[in-house]
Amino acid sequence: MAIGKNKRISKGRKGGRKKVVDPLSRKEFYDLRAPSTFKVRNFGTTIASKNQGTKLAVDALRHRVYEVSLADLNNDEDQAFRKIKLQCEDIQGRTCLTEFHGMDMTRDKLCSLIRKYQTLIEAHCNVKTSDGYVLRLFCIAFTRRMADQVKSTCYAQTSQIRQIRKKMVEIITAEAEGTTLRDLVKKFIPESIGKEIEKACRHIFPLQHVFIRKVKVLSKPSFDVSRLMESHVGADGVEEKGTKVVSESNQATNLLTAEMKA
């Protein structure tokens, strides 16, 4: 041991402390834009790392899937039980253009529909739209009591369940095939397919709470920019733009000055 050496004195680290870098300084924010089927077009923002060498931010953003409540997309709280999946297909500047990628129902809504003394009927089928999308649609329905029924239960027989399930598949196939994905999504929002099934199965057994519970996108056609832009224009074929806001100073008048002039 060397004379005069104190072990308690700690040595300084080699190189000193590293400079703390804010992680967000290496990120970029992009706006998310929904198709024109929904009322609210800009529904949020997403984050991605800046371009570094061969790593591009566009590659990290493309094909990202975002799950949004339909209540936020349409400004309607009655549609809060619907969850819409939107997938980023293209990036233009700082805007991500998304496309419909699926639909689901919230767990609490599904549990609120399931009750005793009734029969739950489910069906699913694969359909192909006119623009080349292959979807798998899941339908759910519940039996209900007749108007003059005294018995508390409303169970359907197995033969009736088979007939209802067959009718479900027929109506879903007829409504989905021959239409574009954009028109099909418009049918999902007001539950027009469920109402059609309930009306068609009335003579077999009365139904209630008929919903398209879930939609899966199994396959998509090859990417086409023109098709994507068509889904992002308004109903009149013109791309939607923001309205001009008139400043308050141009509209407001000074009441005191107006009285003095009078």
From Swiss-Prot:
PANTHER family per record: 40S RIBOSOMAL PROTEIN S3A
GO CC annotation, single: cytosolic small ribosomal subunit
Record-level Gene Ontology MF annotations: structural constituent of ribosome
Entry superkingdom: Eukaryota
Name the record gives this protein: Small ribosomal subunit protein eS1
Family in the record: Belongs to the eukaryotic ribosomal protein eS1 family.
Keyword Ion transport: no
Subcellular location: Cytoplasm
